[in-house]
Amino acid sequence: MEHEVAVSGGDSSLEEITGSSKLKPSKNTAIKCLKCDKVYIFPSDKDDCLAHLYMEHRLVIADVEDIALLEDYLQYWEKEFHTHEFEQYCTTMFLDQLPDGKYAKNEKYYLLCDILPQDYELRRRLKEKRLSEALERHQFELTDRTFSKECLFCRAIIKGLRADYLDHLFDKHFLLVGKPEKLVYVDELLDHLEENLNRLMCLYCEKIFRDRPTLKEHMRKKGHKRINPNRREYDKYFLINYNRVPTAPTPRKQHLQKRRRETASVSTVADPETGSVDFDKHFARPDSDGEHDSDWSDWAADGEPSSIKCLFCHHLGDNFTALKKHMHEVHRLDFEKATSSLNFYQRVKVVNYLRRQMCLLRCVTCDLQFDEEELLVEHMAQESHHGIGDKESWDKPEFFFPYIENDGLLCVLDDSGGDDPDVDTVRIISEDSLAQINKDAERLSLENFKLL
C-alpha cells in the first residue's frame, strides 16, 4: 500500500462548495461520475453511483455513510479529478481479486479517505455546512406561519405553524411523529409519510395492505402510528443527528456488522408460505447483539421492581406493602382505602395524575401552583391535601400513560377492589386474543404518550 502527496490547490473550489447555504432541503440532484460522463440522480441513485465507482473505476470512498452532504462532496472531487489522476489524491492498494470477486494478481484499487488533509478539511466543512443549514431551516420552520397542508388522515387543512399540524396529527389521530422543537425538514418528512400512506404502507413496519381501513386498523392495534426509529432514512429529520461525531467501531461491533452483512441477503426474503417479509428481523437495532427478545435472564425473580417511589416525596419503598405503610404513616394516605372503589384502569389514572401534579409542583387536591417543592410539601401537609384528587381531575384518557419512565408503582397495582366488568368497559377482539379493556384506553396506544 502506498500513498502519494496530494497536489496543492483546490482551496477556492472547496470554499465554493462549502460556502453557500440553502434554506430549503435539496431535492433530486444530478451528480456526474468522478471519472466518466455517467450521471446519477441523488439521493435515489446513490448506491448505484458508489457501485459504479468501485466496479468501473476501482475507487472506494472511506466512511461514505458518515459524509455530510455527499452530493457536495462528490461534486468537489469531480472537479479535482477532472484535471488530476486518482494517484495524486488517493491511497493506492493492490489486491488479488477483481471487483466482481474473481481471482487476479495485483489488481490496483484507490481509496479516497480523510488521511488526506484536503479530504479531511472538506468533510469537516461539509459537516459544519450541513449543521448550519439544518439550524437555519429549523428556526424557519418553528416561526413560519405560511404553512398550509391537508391532514394525512382527514380532509382538514391546517394553516399556520407546523407545530399546529403535528399537534393535530397527535390530538386527533394519535400519530406521533415527533416534537416540533426536535424535528427539521418537516415538510419533506410529511411528504414522505403521505407517500407511504397513499401506497397503503404501514409507517412503522412498512407492510402493504389491501385498503386504507385495513391499514388504519393494523396501525392502531399494533401500535404502529409512529415512524420506525431504526430506519436510517429518518435520521435527517431529527436535529440531534446533525452534531453527532461518528466513533470508531470496536472489535465487537465490527464482528456484529459482519454478521449483519452475512444475514442481510436473506433477512428480506419473503416467507414462501405467507409471502410476507420479516421486517422485525431486517430492521433490528444496529446495537443489538443478535440475541432473541425472549431472553428474560435479567428479569427480577419475584416480578416486582427493586424499589418503588412514593407518590408525594422522594422516598423509595422496598416493596408495595412498605410503600403503602410509608404513605399512611408519613402522608396520612391509606392508598388501599382511597382506591378501594376503583378498578385497575382508574388506579393507573390516579397514579399518573399524582405523578404529574407533583412534577409540575401543583397540589393534588386544590391544584394550587408553587414555585418550590418545599412550599408544595408544606402546603399539602398543613392542609391535609395528601389525597388522590377529584375524579374529574384524573379520569382522563391522557392519564393512561406513565408520566415518569419505568414507574415501579404501575407494575404492582392489582385488579382487586372495585372492578366491575359492566362499568365503563367494552369487550373487543384483538389480533392475538380476546381482551377486556376500558373504552378510553381502547382508543389510545402507548406511543401516544409524549415523553418529557
UniProtKB/Swiss-Prot annotation:
Keywords in alphabetical order: Cytoplasm, DNA-binding, Metal-binding, Nucleus, Repeat, Transcription, Zinc, Zinc-finger
Biological processes, Gene Ontology terms: positive regulation of gene expression
Cellular-component GO terms for this entry: chromatin; cytoplasm; nucleus
Biased composition (Basic residues): 252-261
Molecular function GO terms recorded: chromatin binding; DNA binding; zinc ion binding
InterPro entries, per the entry: ZN622/Rei1/Reh1_Znf-C2H2, ZNF277, Znf_C2H2_sf, Znf_C2H2_type
Localization annotation: Nucleus; Cytoplasm
Subunit details: Interacts with components of the origin recognition complex (ORC) complex, Orc2 and Orc3, components of the SAGA transcription coactivator-HAT complex, Gcn5 and e(y)2, components of the mRNP biogenesis THO complex, thoc5 and e(y)2, and a component of the TFIID complex, TBP. Also interacts with polybromo, a component of the chromatin remodeling SWI/SNF complex.
Function: DNA binding protein which is involved in the positive regulation of both basal and inducible transcription. Mainly localizes to active promoter sites and interacts with components of various transcription and replication regulatory complexes, such as the ORC, SAGA, THO, TFIID and SWI/SNF complexes. It may therefore regulate transcription by promoting the association of these complexes to their binding sites.
Protein's name in the database: Zinc finger protein 277
